[in-house]
């Protein structure tokens, strides 16, 4: 039953059901608050029941108001009128921190809940809202500023944000400038940037679509506008990534600038760039803010593998674009690889050993090693292994690579090799007590851990730990399940072992779906949720604290798979998230910071300054 009473704004209506006598009902008016507000505003306009007069600091105009209204909307006025201050008993109060325009805006808002803003009244309104602690007005001012940011006013909006400590607006302005910096350079507004904001922009990994040379020239323009700005030259130049410029650009455009030759800090920056470029093999262990890729785009990356159809080995390097939910290609390897080892040092991707041809016995193992540089989307060859090896594990630890075990035409391997980027050479370290292949490994706490694998055709459950400082192997608590061709990774203080296969009975292989993690502190294994589907000989990577298991081979289904499964350690849950472009076994995966997908890494602006041979000769 619908009941309606009255007309107009004060009318009410409700849908009622018959009820027993004595039942209590509650009613709410949707219009009462606005009617009361309108009533108070009319009283103010007519000067009725006003009990205090406010006077702005910049004039004598008076604003009669009601103390209760002002105190209900502002902590400032509440403290003034109830906190025992002298103004509590005054009938006329001068507000020295607020001007006429700002005070009128605040009073109108308190009485009407409405606010009109433009660039002419914004700062007066902001100043009054900040002084009088009117938070809704501050929020409206922030929205107004953010919604109107453009190339023509971004510098001014940034100044206002800094003046009034509008953190959200300041962050938005920074992001706007970073996204539109090339366009801003072509306007006069660029030269109005304050030093602090320009330095932030030039230091940011989110700055896109500009070469380091273009950034250097822009910084020089800004410095030369006014003589006092030259005092900032050294501080500004520290944000330019000179090591990433070509030697030709350094000579032709940078060294010809006077302060780059006379200022000690700038001279040292050029020396740093020169030293960096002369040591191409050492670069992964020479990384700094000025040598890092100018990108904030980190992605899951996969490399190589053997195709399900025709058993062709892939040389593809791909990254997964999470936003577009699709795979994108990076520069492929010169030669295909599977059963290889990959590891990352200083955001350089190393690809070690493996096989170029499909061969389950490892007789076509190779010893070659290549390094991918995402800054230029290019590969270069580095020193080869001392031994050919496949089905092995590769770890990056303390700026070195460690290639552990594996197999080759000579048989199963127990040897371990260490690559030193500073010397560009491999050397032997302490070998394992027994040969292993198909094992997995990870690093934690400055130590390398190796689990499972196959020794003399027998699947293992042992866990071994290698200390690079003492060059010794030690035995740890074994896994609860024997397994090989599995994967291993570290999340937090836990070492996860996932998937793989082992013998079912005496001769047939079977997927291992069970998973477990090892606690180095407790020397103890704990089971976790089982995989949804079997995967052996996979790629594994930790991305945003989730474990991604990529591709591989399913022994239960007797085929390569394209599935990518994600494990959430916090929830102890597995999910199928997406697929590879094709089914690939013996694939490898990692995370790498690369240029955003919309950029073309192969453009001339990505010319590599490397002086090392790039023809693999």
Curated annotation (Swiss-Prot):
Keywords: Cell cycle, Cell division, Kelch repeat, Mitosis, Repeat, Ubl conjugation pathway. GO terms for biological process: cell division; protein ubiquitination; regulation of cytokinesis. Kelch repeats lie at residues 300-347, 348-399, 400-446, 448-493, 495-545, 546-595. Pathway: Protein modification; protein ubiquitination. SUPFAM superfamilies: Kelch motif (SSF117281), POZ domain (SSF54695). Residues 50-119 form the BTB domain. Transmembrane segments: none annotated. GO terms for molecular function: cullin family protein binding. PROSITE patterns: BTB. Residues 154-255 form the BACK domain. GO terms for cellular component: Cul3-RING ubiquitin ligase complex; midbody. Residues 595-617 are annotated as: Disordered. It comes from the Eukaryota. CDD domains: BACK_KLHL9_13 (cd18449), BTB_POZ_KLHL9_13 (cd18239). InterPro entries: BACK (IPR011705), BTB-kelch_protein (IPR017096), BTB/POZ_dom (IPR000210), Kelch-typ_b-propeller (IPR015915), Kelch_1 (IPR006652), SKP1/BTB/POZ_sf (IPR011333). Substrate-specific adapter of a BCR (BTB-CUL3-RBX1) E3 ubiquitin-protein ligase complex required for mitotic progression and cytokinesis. The BCR(KLHL9-KLHL13) E3 ubiquitin ligase complex mediates the ubiquitination of AURKB and controls the dynamic behavior of AURKB on mitotic chromosomes and thereby coordinates faithful mitotic progression and completion of cytokinesis. Component of the BCR(KLHL9-KLHL13) E3 ubiquitin ligase complex, at least composed of CUL3, KLHL9, KLHL13 and RBX1. Interacts with AURKB. PANTHER family: KELCH-LIKE PROTEIN 9, LD33804P. This is Kelch-like protein 9.
């Amino acid at each position: 039953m619908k009941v309606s009473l009255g007309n107009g704004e004060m009318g009410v209506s409700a849908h009622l059901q018959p009820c027993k006598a004595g039942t209590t009902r509650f009613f709410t008016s949707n219009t009462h608050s606005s009617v009361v507000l309108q009533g108070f505003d009319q009283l103010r306009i007519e000067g009725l029941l006003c009990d205090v007069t406010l006077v702005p600091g910049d004039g004598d105009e008076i604003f009669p108001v009601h103390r209760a209204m002002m105190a209900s909307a502002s902590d400032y006025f509440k403290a003034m009128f109830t906190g025992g201050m002298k103004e509590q008993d005054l009938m006329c109060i001068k507000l020295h921190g607020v001007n006429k325009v700002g005070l009128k805006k605040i009073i109108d808002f308190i009485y009407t809940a409405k606010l009109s803003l433009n660039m002419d009244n914004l700062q007066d309104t902001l100043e009054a809202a900040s002084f009088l602690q009117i938070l809704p007005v501050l929020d409206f001012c922030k929205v107004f500023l953010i919604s109107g940011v453009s190339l023509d006013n971004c510098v001014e909006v940034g100044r206002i944000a800094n003046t009034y400590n509008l953190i959200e607006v300041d962050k938005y302005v920074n992001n706007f400038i970073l996204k539109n910096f090339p366009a801003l350079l072509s306007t006069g507004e660029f030269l109005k940037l304050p030093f602090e904001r320009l330095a932030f922009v030039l230091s940011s990994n989110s700055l896109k679509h500009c070469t380091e040379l273009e950034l250097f020239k822009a910084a020089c323009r800004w410095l030369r506008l006014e003589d006092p700005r030259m005092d900032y030259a050294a501080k500004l130049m520290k944000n330019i990534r000179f090591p990433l410029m070509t030697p030709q650009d350094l000579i032709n455009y940078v060294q010809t600038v006077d302060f780059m030759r006379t200022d000690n800090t700038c001279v040292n920056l050029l020396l740093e760039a020169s030293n960096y470029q002369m040591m191409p093999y050492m670069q992964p262990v020479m990384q700094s803010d000025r040598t890092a890729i100018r990108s904030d785009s980190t992605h899951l990356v996969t490399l190589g593998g053997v195709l399900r159809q025709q058993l062709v080995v892939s040389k593809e390097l791909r990254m997964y674009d999470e936003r577009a939910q699709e795979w994108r290609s990076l520069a492929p390897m010169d030669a295909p690889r599977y059963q290889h080892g990959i590891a990352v040092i200083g955001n350089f991707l190393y690809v070690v050993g493996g096989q170029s041809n499909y061969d389950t016995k490892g007789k076509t193992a190779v010893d070659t090693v290549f390094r991918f540089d995402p800054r230029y989307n290019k590969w270069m060859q580095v020193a080869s292994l001392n031994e050919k090896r496949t089905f092995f594990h590769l770890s990056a630890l303390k700026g070195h690579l460690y290639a552990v075990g594996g197999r080759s035409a000579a048989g199963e391997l127990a040897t371990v090799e260490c690559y030193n980027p500073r010397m560009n050479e491999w050397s032997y370290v302490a070998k394992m007590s027994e040969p292993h292949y198909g094992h997995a490994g990870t690093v934690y706490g400055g130590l390398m851990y190796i689990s499972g694998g196959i020794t003399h055709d027998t699947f293992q459950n042992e866990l071994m730990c290698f200390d690079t400082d003492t060059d010794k192997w030690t035995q740890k608590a074994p896994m609860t399940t024997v397994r090989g061709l599995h994967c291993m990774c570290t999340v937090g203080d836990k070492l996860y072992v996932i998937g793989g296969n082992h013998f079912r009975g005496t001769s047939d292989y079977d997927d291992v779906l069970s998973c477990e993690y090892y606690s180095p502190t407790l020397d103890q294994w704990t089971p976790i949720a089982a995989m949804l589907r079997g995967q052996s000989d996979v790629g594994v990577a930790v991305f945003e604290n989730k474990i991604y298991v990529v591709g591989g081979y399913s022994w239960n289904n007797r085929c390569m798979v394209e599935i990518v499964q994600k494990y959430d350690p916090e929830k102890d849950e597995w999910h199928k998230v997406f697929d590879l472009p094709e089914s690939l076994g013996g694939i490898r995966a990692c995370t790498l910071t690369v240029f955003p997908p919309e950029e073309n890494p192969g453009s001339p602006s990505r010319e590599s300054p490397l002086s090392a041979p790039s023809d693999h000769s």
